[in-house]
Structure formats: C-alpha cells, structure tokens
Curated annotation (Swiss-Prot):
Pfam families: M20_dimer, Peptidase_M20. One of its GO terms (cellular component) is cytoplasm. It is found in: Cytoplasm; Mitochondrion. The keyword DNA repair does not apply. The keyword Plastid does not apply. Its main location: cytoplasm. Disruption phenotype: Accumulation of Cys-Gly dipeptide and enhanced GSH toxicity. This is Cys-Gly metallodipeptidase DUG1. Zn(2+) 2 binds at H102, D137, D200.
Amino acid sequence: MSHSLTSVFQKIDSLKPQFFSRLTKAIQIPAVSSDESLRSKVFDKAKFISEQLSQSGFHDIKMVDLGIQPPPISTPNLSLPPVILSRFGSDPSKKTVLVYGHYDVQPAQLEDGWDTEPFKLVIDEAKGIMKGRGVTDDTGPLLSWINVVDAFKASGQEFPVNLVTCFEGMEESGSLKLDELIKKEANGYFKGVDAVCISDNYWLGTKKPVLTYGLRGCNYYQTIIEGPSADLHSGIFGGVVAEPMIDLMQVLGSLVDSKGKILIDGIDEMVAPLTEKEKALYKDIEFSVEELNAATGSKTSLYDKKEDILMHRWRYPSLSIHGVEGAFSAQGAKTVIPAKVFGKFSIRTVPDMDSEKLTSLVQKHCDAKFKSLNSPNKCRTELIHDGAYWVSDPFNAQFTAAKKATKLVYGVDPDFTREGGSIPITLTFQDALNTSVLLLPMGRGDDGAHSINEKLDISNFVGGMKTMAAYLQYYSESPEN
C-alpha cells in the first residue's frame, strides 16, 4: 500500500466519531420524498448536506431548482427537492470523477415493526451495526464521499482527482426531472467528467464484496377502481353494491402467480434470450440459497439452485404487488367499503424490454381482466414512473481500479455482479456524459434497505470509505480515461 493511502486509512479510522456524528444528524431528518407532508424535511436535509459540503471545502455548490412536481400529486404547486451539485478540486491535469447519491429515503414508522425509532440512528458497537432509515440507502454512502475528502485533507495527502457531486432528493420517487438536468449539464457543470461512480446498491451476500455492472429497470403502476361516491357501511350496503376492493383483488391477482411467473401476455417475448456464454458467468459467483434465506429471515425462496436464484434476480423480469391506497389498513377492525382504491405494483425490467410497449401490455391485460368481471365500477391503469435497465463494461479502467481497491481493503477479489434493483439514472449518466458508470456498493445483502430495521455494518461503513479512497487513488493512476 502506498504511503498516501496508509495515511488516509489511518485518518478514516481516527475520524470515525466525527463521521458517526455527521450521519446521526442526517438520519434524524425524515426526508421521505413520497410523503408530500414531509416535503419540507427533504429540503431540510438538502440544506444540511450543502452545509456539510461547504464545511469540507467543496466549492461551486449549487442547489438546483427542478420546479414543480408533475401529477399525480395531492398537493398543488409542490416543489421538487433540489439537486446538489458541487466540486472538490478543478485541476485540469487530474481526472474528474462524478459521484452520485440520493438523500431522500423510504417511508418508515415505529409501528411498521421497527425495533427502534427509524429516524434516530442507533450505533451498536458491540454488535458492530448502525440502524436507522437511510443508513445504507443512501445517506451513509452519500456522506462517505464527504468523509473521504475530510480524511485526505486531515492526512495532508493530495486529493487524487477532481470530484463532482450530484446528490438528488427524489430517487425513491422516480428521480423526477433529473434526466433533463443531466442532459442539460452534460456540456455545462458536468463537462469533462471522465467517470461516474454510484454507491447505492449492496453486496450480493454478507461476506464477499462485489462490483456491479448491471441493473434491472423499474416500471411502477397503479390500477384504480372507482365505485360509490363515498365510503359505505358494509352492514347496510354489503352484498348489494359492487365493491371496488373486490374488483381490485381480482385484477391484481391476475398479474402474477404464486411462483413469481408474470401472467401478462407478451412480456416473455421481450426478454433477451440467455446465451451459453452468459450462463457460464454465474458458475463462479459465491452465493447460496442459505445466504438468501439469511437476508430474508425466512425459507421462502422459489428456487434451490444458485444460478436460478441469480438469474431471476438479475436478468429476468419480476412483478411485485406493493399495497393498496384508499383502503383500511390500521390496527383493529373497521367495517367500511372503500369507494375508491389504488392498487400499486411494479415490474422490474431487463434487456430488451421496451417501456412503452410494456405499459401497453399491462394496461391491455388489466382492462381485459376488469371487463371479464362485468362490474359497474370504473377501472383504469396508469404508469406512475419508469426507469430503464443498465449494463456496463466490467473490464474498463475504473472497474479495474475498483477491483484493486476492494482487494486492498478486504483481501479478496470482488465478484462481478448484476443487480435486481433499479437506479434509473445510471443509463442517463452513461449516455449523456458518454462515459463509464461504476456501481461500488458499501452495504451487505442483509441490510434491509426499504424494510424495517435498516442497518449498515460499521465494518462496511469504514471499509467502504477506505475502498472509495483507494478507488479514487488507483483510478487517478490508470493509463486511460
């Protein structure tokens, strides 16, 4: 290891209390982008991050206004959270790396089943974990880029690259209007960017680090069933009116079977066929059904073989039903017939699926199923947001640098993986900036992002920051841009 990285690593270790403090302050802000009533908190978190950037010596900090959020929304003239752009360094002799992250988080409430308050960071050094909403997705990794700059400065070592940040506040709600900003700034603020690095995904399992070169996309839909003009008493009207909730259950139940097979005609034909060369890539990846069971806390896997699990997680589409808006969901018993219900579901997309064609197939299927019910209610299905799938080259300069950095920190070569989740903006960065995108995960596969008791292992937090630092150093030394 070079002397410079040794010094930086030592500072990452010694500055850990400062980094814990920064993360604690960030986690306590409930920046839930999907909750319109909490939009001011998303703005508060943007301000906090901007202040942290300024204190750490970043310059040219811009809080880019994205305007008003488009429908469907309940709050008129709802402002979108800003995108935070900033720079650290502007040396033309150095390579420029853009780092992306998001400061918004998923909804979380104690009554959802959390062991602790979700917006109060719990640091359990005895167990070696930190727990809180956003700690792994994506507040912890986002702040780590700032922490790495602090560690280089404290060590007295020269920062190896020019760093550009692009931190958004709507990733959990479709990254609205970020595409347009990136395309607009491709020859502006982002001009000269040599590589893009994103730390917003996870190790495949819990033991071995990975580098990720592909993601599924995500099309999110809602089916709306509308009946009576107001909610009704089931004792008076049950059995004599067509209930929207019953219709909705029929429509949602027709989308996918209990084995995960999507039942919408035409989807299978859009999926790129599996080649023998691609199939061979799965053989050497370290993963087992036991790791999947550990990550889910159950034995509910639909597949027994490693290859089948990974292919259905990475390279085949899936359909998930997420919930129903407008229906009773609190504790206790309420005998109401809801007048209007919104069934939420999404499809994870893969090469070579086309979003417009997929939406057409989904709407056609839902309309046909509803028509078969002969219900007097009204039904429509609409796309809420979509994000494209993405695949990169795992053998280019920055993947090579990241591989070397991972080996230095963790002592093993990382697995090269694709991922089942979606970061819609990856493809936009790749195409608009005409550059490579690397996914450099910090957290483990059992972190529980989007779930209760979201956590990040302290060893991954510290090791992740060291990997980020070494990646930037090694990439700066690579012979090609």
